[in-house]
């Protein structure tokens, strides 16, 4: 239980816009393909934003841990998934989220509901603000709480493996205003139904938020 809680807390803390403006600039540029398919290293990172070697080393480690930099044989490269690769990743996340929602329908998850509702409220606020990255991160924080509420360490480990910060940014790069409105409607349904004995509609909205956010089930 302690390991699961620590895993959740660490993942949720990471799932946020960087407080370092230079780091945030690099995150956004990498996902929007402004760096192309070139390799990267600490020195080149520091050069991009005019920082020193220590900053470059720390930034390189942080970008690797959050999924923005991947290992490609003997070099490091930016995470720039193809459309299919991102579709597959989104489907994996949706499948785990559905499994968690179904599991919670047979549990007493009342202790987790205040936190889930607060995170849903945060998602609504971010969506109202129109920032797709902030909304995508808020979506992931809400879903992290839902998966964690099952109490299943293996499910949580699997989810954290797929739900990287870089994936949240890549998803955000696809989102438009209509998607944010749909996500708000789905989030409201999810918090109303999570933990009830009829999880089908709740699970369907979770899938909608991932696969077709502008078309919620209960539009």
PLM features per residue range, with description:
Residues 3, 134-138, 181-182:
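Short acidic alpha-helix initiation/capping motifs at coil-to-helix transition points
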Residues 19-22, 29-30, 40, 79-145, ...:
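All-alpha effector-binding/dimerization core of bacterial HTH-type transcriptional repressors
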Residues 65-69, 162-164, 180:
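Mobile beta-alpha loop/short-helix "lid" or hinge segments that flank ligand
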Residues 119, 161-165, 205-209:
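Short acidic/histidine-centered micro-motifs embedded in hydrophobic/aromatic stretches
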Residues 171-219:
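C-terminal all-alpha effector/ligand-binding and dimerization domain
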């Amino acid at each position: 239980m302690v390991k699961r809680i620590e895993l959740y807390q660490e993942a949720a803390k990471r799932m946020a816009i960087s407080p370092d403006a230079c780091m945030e600039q690099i995150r956004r540029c990498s996902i929007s393909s402004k760096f192309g398919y070139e390799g990267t290293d600490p020195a080149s990172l520091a050069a991009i934003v005019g920082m020193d070697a220590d900053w470059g080393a720390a930034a390189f480690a942080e970008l690797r841990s959050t999924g923005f930099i991947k290992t490609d044989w003997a070099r490091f490269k930016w995470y720039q998934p193809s459309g299919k690769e991102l579709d597959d990743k989104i489907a994996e996340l949706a499948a785990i989220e559905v499994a968690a929602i179904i599991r919670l329908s047979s549990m007493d998850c009342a202790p987790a509901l205040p936190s889930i509702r607060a995170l849903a409220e945060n998602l609504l606020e971010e969506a109202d603000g129109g920032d797709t990255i902030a909304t995508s991160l808020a979506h992931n924080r809400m879903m992290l709480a839902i998966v964690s509420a099952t109490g299943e360490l293996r499910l949580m480990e699997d989810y954290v493996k797929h739900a990287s910060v870089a994936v949240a940014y890549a998803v955000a790069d696809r989102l438009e205003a209509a998607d944010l409105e749909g996500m708000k409607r789905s989030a409201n349904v999810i918090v109303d139904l999570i933990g009830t004995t009829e999880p089908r509609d709740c699970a369907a909205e979770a899938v909608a938020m991932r696969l077709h956010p502008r078309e919620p089930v209960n539009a």
